[in-house]
Amino acid sequence: PVIYGGTGNGPAFIERTADIHQAVQDIIASKTFDNGVVSAAEQSVVVDSCIAAEVRLEFEASGAYFMTEEEAERLGKLFYFKDGSANPELAGKAAEDLARWAKIDVPAGTKVLLAEQKYVSENNPYSKEKLCPVLSYFIEDDWMHACEKCIELLLSERHGHTLVIHSKDPDVIHQFAIKKPVGRMLVNTPAVYGSMGATTNLFPAMTLGSGSAGQGITSDNVSPMNLIYVRKVGYGVRRIEDLGMGTPADASGCRGAAADEDSLRKLQRLLEDALASINNQL
Protein backbone atom coordinates (compact mmCIF):
# COMPACT_ATOMS: atom_id res chain seq x y z
CA PRO A 1 0.00 0.00 0.00
CA VAL A 2 1.04 3.57 -0.64
CA ILE A 3 1.64 5.90 2.30
CA TYR A 4 0.44 9.18 0.91
CA GLY A 5 1.49 12.53 2.36
CA GLY A 6 -0.64 14.66 0.12
CA THR A 7 -0.92 18.17 -1.20
CA GLY A 8 -1.18 20.79 1.50
CA ASN A 9 -3.44 23.81 1.09
CA GLY A 10 -3.70 24.75 4.72
CA PRO A 11 -5.11 28.08 5.89
CA ALA A 12 -4.19 29.91 9.08
CA PHE A 13 -6.99 31.74 10.86
CA ILE A 14 -6.13 34.70 13.10
CA GLU A 15 -9.11 35.09 15.42
CA ARG A 16 -9.87 38.30 17.32
CA THR A 17 -8.54 36.99 20.65
CA ALA A 18 -5.18 35.96 19.18
CA ASP A 19 -1.81 37.36 20.14
CA ILE A 20 -1.47 39.21 16.83
CA HIS A 21 2.26 39.86 17.04
CA GLN A 22 3.03 36.21 17.82
CA ALA A 23 0.61 34.91 15.19
CA VAL A 24 2.23 36.98 12.45
CA GLN A 25 5.73 36.00 13.56
CA ASP A 26 4.74 32.34 13.53
CA ILE A 27 3.24 32.55 10.05
CA ILE A 28 6.24 34.35 8.56
CA ALA A 29 8.73 31.99 10.23
CA SER A 30 6.79 29.03 8.89
CA LYS A 31 6.24 30.31 5.34
CA THR A 32 9.87 31.36 4.92
CA PHE A 33 11.23 27.99 6.10
CA ASP A 34 12.92 26.59 2.97
CA ASN A 35 11.16 29.41 1.11
CA GLY A 36 7.79 27.72 1.41
CA VAL A 37 8.42 24.30 -0.13
CA VAL A 38 7.04 22.33 2.83
CA SER A 39 3.47 21.23 2.07
CA ALA A 40 2.37 21.87 5.65
CA ALA A 41 3.26 25.57 5.41
CA GLU A 42 0.44 28.10 5.51
CA GLN A 43 -1.01 28.83 2.07
CA SER A 44 -3.64 31.37 3.10
CA VAL A 45 -4.28 33.71 6.01
CA VAL A 46 -7.88 34.26 7.11
CA VAL A 47 -8.37 37.23 9.44
CA ASP A 48 -11.20 38.37 11.70
CA SER A 49 -12.33 41.72 10.24
CA CYS A 50 -12.23 43.58 13.56
CA ILE A 51 -8.46 43.05 13.81
CA ALA A 52 -7.63 43.13 10.08
CA ALA A 53 -6.01 46.57 10.13
CA GLU A 54 -3.79 45.65 13.08
CA VAL A 55 -2.83 42.34 11.48
CA ARG A 56 -1.89 44.05 8.24
CA LEU A 57 0.32 46.58 10.03
CA GLU A 58 2.02 43.76 11.92
CA PHE A 59 2.71 41.87 8.70
CA GLU A 60 4.15 44.97 7.03
CA ALA A 61 6.33 45.72 10.05
CA SER A 62 7.65 42.15 9.91
CA GLY A 63 8.82 42.17 6.29
CA ALA A 64 5.66 41.24 4.40
CA TYR A 65 4.50 43.08 1.28
CA PHE A 66 0.84 43.38 0.27
CA MET A 67 0.59 43.36 -3.51
CA THR A 68 -1.86 45.51 -5.40
CA GLU A 69 -4.52 43.72 -7.43
CA GLU A 70 -2.53 44.31 -10.63
CA GLU A 71 0.71 43.07 -9.07
CA ALA A 72 -0.99 39.96 -7.71
CA GLU A 73 -2.42 39.22 -11.14
CA ARG A 74 1.01 39.50 -12.77
CA LEU A 75 2.57 37.15 -10.25
CA GLY A 76 -0.39 34.78 -10.37
CA LYS A 77 0.09 34.24 -14.10
CA LEU A 78 3.56 32.85 -13.41
CA PHE A 79 2.38 30.09 -11.06
CA TYR A 80 0.88 27.79 -13.68
CA PHE A 81 1.38 27.00 -17.34
CA LYS A 82 -1.50 27.08 -19.83
CA ASP A 83 -2.02 23.32 -19.46
CA GLY A 84 -2.65 23.79 -15.73
CA SER A 85 0.64 22.32 -14.54
CA ALA A 86 2.60 24.17 -11.86
CA ASN A 87 5.67 26.18 -12.82
CA PRO A 88 8.56 24.48 -10.95
CA GLU A 89 10.78 27.53 -11.38
CA LEU A 90 8.86 29.38 -8.66
CA ALA A 91 9.15 26.65 -6.03
CA GLY A 92 11.49 27.57 -3.21
CA LYS A 93 12.37 31.01 -4.57
CA ALA A 94 12.75 33.98 -2.23
CA ALA A 95 10.08 36.68 -2.15
CA GLU A 96 12.37 39.31 -3.66
CA ASP A 97 13.21 37.02 -6.59
CA LEU A 98 9.53 36.33 -7.22
CA ALA A 99 8.79 40.05 -7.13
CA ARG A 100 11.57 40.75 -9.61
CA TRP A 101 10.21 38.17 -12.07
CA ALA A 102 6.74 39.71 -11.83
CA LYS A 103 8.17 43.23 -12.15
CA ILE A 104 6.98 44.22 -8.67
CA ASP A 105 8.97 46.83 -6.79
CA VAL A 106 9.26 45.69 -3.17
CA PRO A 107 11.34 47.01 -0.25
CA ALA A 108 14.71 45.37 0.35
CA GLY A 109 14.43 42.53 2.81
CA THR A 110 10.88 41.57 1.88
CA LYS A 111 10.21 38.07 3.23
CA VAL A 112 6.67 37.24 2.14
CA LEU A 113 4.26 38.45 -0.56
CA LEU A 114 0.54 38.63 0.23
CA ALA A 115 -2.38 38.88 -2.18
CA GLU A 116 -5.72 40.00 -0.76
CA GLN A 117 -8.53 37.82 -2.12
CA LYS A 118 -12.30 37.62 -1.73
CA TYR A 119 -13.26 34.31 -3.31
CA VAL A 120 -11.99 30.76 -3.64
CA SER A 121 -12.16 29.31 -7.14
CA GLU A 122 -10.63 26.50 -9.16
CA ASN A 123 -8.99 28.92 -11.59
CA ASN A 124 -7.55 31.23 -8.95
CA PRO A 125 -3.85 30.44 -8.36
CA TYR A 126 -4.11 31.99 -4.92
CA SER A 127 -6.69 29.36 -3.92
CA LYS A 128 -4.11 26.61 -4.39
CA GLU A 129 -0.89 25.35 -2.86
CA LYS A 130 2.00 27.77 -3.41
CA LEU A 131 5.44 26.28 -2.75
CA CYS A 132 7.06 29.66 -2.24
CA PRO A 133 6.72 32.56 0.26
CA VAL A 134 3.39 33.80 -1.13
CA LEU A 135 0.15 33.89 0.87
CA SER A 136 -3.42 34.65 -0.06
CA TYR A 137 -5.16 36.92 2.44
CA PHE A 138 -8.87 36.81 3.30
CA ILE A 139 -10.86 39.04 5.66
CA GLU A 140 -14.04 37.60 7.20
CA ASP A 141 -16.68 39.17 9.45
CA ASP A 142 -16.41 36.66 12.29
CA TRP A 143 -15.11 33.22 13.20
CA MET A 144 -18.14 31.46 11.68
CA HIS A 145 -17.54 33.01 8.25
CA ALA A 146 -13.82 32.35 8.68
CA CYS A 147 -14.63 28.73 9.46
CA GLU A 148 -16.51 28.36 6.17
CA LYS A 149 -13.73 30.11 4.26
CA CYS A 150 -11.18 27.71 5.71
CA ILE A 151 -13.33 24.75 4.67
CA GLU A 152 -13.61 26.19 1.14
CA LEU A 153 -9.84 26.47 0.93
CA LEU A 154 -9.28 22.99 2.30
CA LEU A 155 -11.77 21.41 -0.09
CA SER A 156 -10.46 23.32 -3.11
CA GLU A 157 -7.39 21.10 -3.38
CA ARG A 158 -7.19 17.64 -1.82
CA HIS A 159 -8.18 18.20 1.76
CA GLY A 160 -7.04 16.29 4.80
CA HIS A 161 -3.70 17.91 5.54
CA THR A 162 -3.29 20.76 8.05
CA LEU A 163 -5.09 23.77 9.51
CA VAL A 164 -3.77 26.41 11.92
CA ILE A 165 -5.76 28.62 14.26
CA HIS A 166 -4.38 31.47 16.35
CA SER A 167 -6.85 32.12 19.16
CA LYS A 168 -7.28 32.25 22.93
CA ASP A 169 -10.97 31.33 22.79
CA PRO A 170 -11.38 27.62 23.70
CA ASP A 171 -14.91 27.48 22.27
CA VAL A 172 -13.81 28.74 18.85
CA ILE A 173 -10.85 26.37 18.87
CA HIS A 174 -13.20 23.49 19.71
CA GLN A 175 -15.59 24.38 16.88
CA PHE A 176 -12.72 24.45 14.41
CA ALA A 177 -11.39 21.13 15.69
CA ILE A 178 -14.65 19.23 15.24
CA LYS A 179 -15.58 20.63 11.83
CA LYS A 180 -12.48 20.81 9.66
CA PRO A 181 -11.60 18.00 7.20
CA VAL A 182 -7.94 17.82 8.21
CA GLY A 183 -5.56 15.27 9.66
CA ARG A 184 -4.08 17.76 12.11
CA MET A 185 -5.18 21.09 13.52
CA LEU A 186 -2.47 23.25 15.05
CA VAL A 187 -3.15 25.89 17.69
CA ASN A 188 -0.99 28.99 18.24
CA THR A 189 2.09 27.60 16.51
CA PRO A 190 3.84 27.81 13.11
CA ALA A 191 2.39 25.28 10.68
CA VAL A 192 5.69 23.86 9.44
CA TYR A 193 7.25 23.41 12.85
CA GLY A 194 4.04 22.36 14.58
CA SER A 195 3.00 19.78 12.01
CA MET A 196 6.34 17.97 12.13
CA GLY A 197 6.27 17.85 15.93
CA ALA A 198 8.99 20.43 16.62
CA THR A 199 6.76 22.91 18.49
CA THR A 200 3.95 20.48 19.36
CA ASN A 201 3.71 16.99 20.82
CA LEU A 202 2.76 15.42 17.50
CA PHE A 203 4.99 12.53 16.47
CA PRO A 204 8.20 13.92 14.90
CA ALA A 205 7.93 13.29 11.16
CA MET A 206 8.50 14.88 7.78
CA THR A 207 5.84 12.79 6.01
CA LEU A 208 2.40 13.97 7.07
CA GLY A 209 -0.52 11.72 6.23
CA SER A 210 -3.77 13.14 4.89
CA GLY A 211 -6.02 10.16 5.59
CA SER A 212 -8.77 8.89 3.32
CA ALA A 213 -10.02 12.46 2.83
CA GLY A 214 -6.73 13.25 1.15
CA GLN A 215 -6.55 9.87 -0.64
CA GLY A 216 -4.10 8.31 1.79
CA ILE A 217 -4.13 5.39 4.23
CA THR A 218 -3.42 7.35 7.41
CA SER A 219 -3.88 10.84 8.82
CA ASP A 220 -0.98 10.34 11.23
CA ASN A 221 2.44 11.84 11.12
CA VAL A 222 4.03 8.84 9.41
CA SER A 223 6.31 7.01 11.83
CA PRO A 224 8.10 3.65 11.99
CA MET A 225 4.84 2.22 13.35
CA ASN A 226 3.30 2.75 9.89
CA LEU A 227 6.11 0.76 8.29
CA ILE A 228 6.63 -2.29 10.49
CA TYR A 229 4.89 -5.64 10.01
CA VAL A 230 2.86 -6.71 13.04
CA ARG A 231 1.45 -10.24 13.22
CA LYS A 232 -1.72 -10.64 15.27
CA VAL A 233 -2.81 -14.00 16.70
CA GLY A 234 -6.49 -14.64 17.39
CA TYR A 235 -7.54 -17.61 19.57
CA GLY A 236 -10.99 -19.12 19.20
CA VAL A 237 -13.13 -18.13 22.17
CA ARG A 238 -16.55 -19.47 21.09
CA ARG A 239 -17.98 -22.12 18.77
CA ILE A 240 -20.01 -21.42 15.65
CA GLU A 241 -23.04 -23.09 17.24
CA ASP A 242 -22.90 -20.56 20.06
CA LEU A 243 -23.35 -17.62 17.71
CA GLY A 244 -27.05 -18.32 17.29
CA MET A 245 -27.74 -18.89 20.99
CA GLY A 246 -27.62 -15.34 22.27
CA THR A 247 -24.03 -15.49 23.51
CA PRO A 248 -22.53 -12.12 22.69
CA ALA A 249 -18.84 -11.60 22.21
CA ASP A 250 -16.88 -10.13 25.09
CA ALA A 251 -16.62 -6.47 24.12
CA SER A 252 -14.58 -5.41 27.12
CA GLY A 253 -11.78 -4.29 24.86
CA CYS A 254 -13.88 -1.55 23.27
CA ARG A 255 -17.33 -0.98 24.79
CA GLY A 256 -17.30 -3.02 28.00
CA ALA A 257 -20.37 -3.97 30.06
CA ALA A 258 -22.18 -0.84 28.99
CA ALA A 259 -22.73 -2.20 25.47
CA ASP A 260 -26.15 -1.24 24.20
CA GLU A 261 -28.60 -4.17 24.41
CA ASP A 262 -30.49 -3.13 21.31
CA SER A 263 -27.27 -3.12 19.31
CA LEU A 264 -26.47 -6.61 20.59
CA ARG A 265 -29.90 -7.88 19.54
CA LYS A 266 -29.42 -6.41 16.07
CA LEU A 267 -26.00 -8.03 15.86
CA GLN A 268 -27.46 -11.37 16.95
CA ARG A 269 -30.14 -11.18 14.24
CA LEU A 270 -27.51 -10.39 11.63
CA LEU A 271 -25.41 -13.36 12.71
CA GLU A 272 -28.45 -15.66 12.72
CA ASP A 273 -29.36 -14.55 9.20
CA ALA A 274 -25.78 -15.10 8.05
CA LEU A 275 -25.66 -18.60 9.57
CA ALA A 276 -29.00 -19.49 8.03
CA SER A 277 -27.74 -18.38 4.64
CA ILE A 278 -24.60 -20.50 5.05
CA ASN A 279 -26.60 -23.57 6.12
CA ASN A 280 -28.90 -23.23 3.10
CA GLN A 281 -25.89 -23.37 0.81
CA LEU A 282 -24.49 -26.55 2.41
Language model segments and positions:
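Intrinsic structural disorder
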Residues: 1, 11-14, 23, 28, ...
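ALDH superfamily catalytic-core signature
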Residues: 1-121
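Conserved C-terminal structural/oligomerization subdomain of aldehyde/semialdehyde dehydrogenase
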Residues: 104-281
